Amino acid sequence: MSSILSSNFTNKSNQLVNESAVDSSLTASPCSTQPGDVGWCFDAPHGVLTKLPNETRAIVSAVSPNWRVTSIGEKTLAIMIPHDQPVLGISKKNFVDLLEFAEDKLEMERVLAVFEKARINPTEGFPRTLRYVGFRPYAIDEHPVHLPAEKYFIMSYKV
């Protein structure tokens, strides 16, 4: 799949990533209880999550500023999506750009959409929409240890 990114992202992706261009805050998002905040965090141990280029966060934020992203291992990109993510208002082009970036630039093998299980219905809303673009529910017995099936509903997309 060839990547068609906007010129802002294309210029940045041509630069080499060095240590200063890596966002260390992506190893874990702090939990927040402030009004308006999404109210969840990645609760994986620091050694499990991998640093990503700042460019990754910019591309994810172009889809939705409320999404959080990290890499689990070398070949899996995980995106935490708030339970109240509206279906409307998400740019289809930006979402496809994100999937292409994960494949072409980050060389990921899969993208995980992670939802708090207690706060969503897997057959409605945004999880339902993701099924139309090729995301499939992740088998409960395949959940990463730090994203337990009791707490998270995960959908997987093979890039």
UniProtKB/Swiss-Prot annotation:
Pfam families: ODC_AZ (PF02100)
InterPro entries the UniProt entry points to: Acyl_CoA_acyltransferase, ODC_AZ, ODC_AZ_sf
GO molecular function, one term: ornithine decarboxylase inhibitor activity
Coiled-coil features, chain-numbered ranges: none
GO terms under biological process: positive regulation of protein catabolic process; viral translational frameshifting
Domain of life: Eukaryota
Any one of the GO CC terms: nucleus
General function of this protein: Ornithine decarboxylase (ODC) antizyme protein that negatively regulates ODC activity and intracellular polyamine biosynthesis and uptake in response to increased intracellular polyamine levels. Binds to ODC monomers, inhibiting the assembly of the functional ODC homodimer, and targets the monomers for ubiquitin-independent proteolytic destruction by the 26S proteasome.
Family: Belongs to the ODC antizyme family.
Quaternary structure and partners: Interacts with ODC1 and thereby sterically blocks ODC homodimerization.
Protein name (database record): Ornithine decarboxylase antizyme
Lineage, opening ranks: Eukaryota, Metazoa, Ecdysozoa, Nematoda, Chromadorea
